[in-house]
């Protein structure tokens, strides 16, 4: 799914959450909200993104060509949007040199990015959603190791 579609869905869900919290009375349990007859079935969200038509075409094999290659793993959770997030795991502790051999004089380290996801609620409020931060490993990079000299 594209960034644009993901952003639109996240904004839609956040808008619904705000409307629900501001216009709905409490249900049987104090933590859950119940819909009344004026509860909106849909919400229109206007999203303004700069450089809307900019397309970024990149090679899809960075994970193999990098001096710090990684493998992508599917992280799937049906109670989260997006339900599938691809995460990287560094293949080696060291880095690949020009000859294609692993050099342990350098370190392969993960690159992490914090993203926002929407999580579906469960008992006692199954029809609720909450926004959460998630730390995702998006790739790996090669760095010089930190060396501590013992005097």
Swiss-Prot record:
One of its GO terms (molecular function) is cytokine activity. Disulfide bonds join 90-140, 95-142. It is found in: Secreted. One of its GO terms (cellular component) is extracellular space. It comes from the Viruses. Keywords: Cytokine, Disulfide bond, Early protein, Glycoprotein, Secreted, Signal. InterPro entries: Cystine-knot_cytokine, IL-17_chr, IL-17_fam. Residues 1-22 form the signal peptide. Glycans are attached at residues 36, 53, 64. The keyword Transmembrane does not apply. Belongs to the IL-17 family. This is Viral interleukin-17. The lineage of its organism: Viruses, Duplodnaviria, Heunggongvirae, Peploviricota, Herviviricetes. The gene is 13.
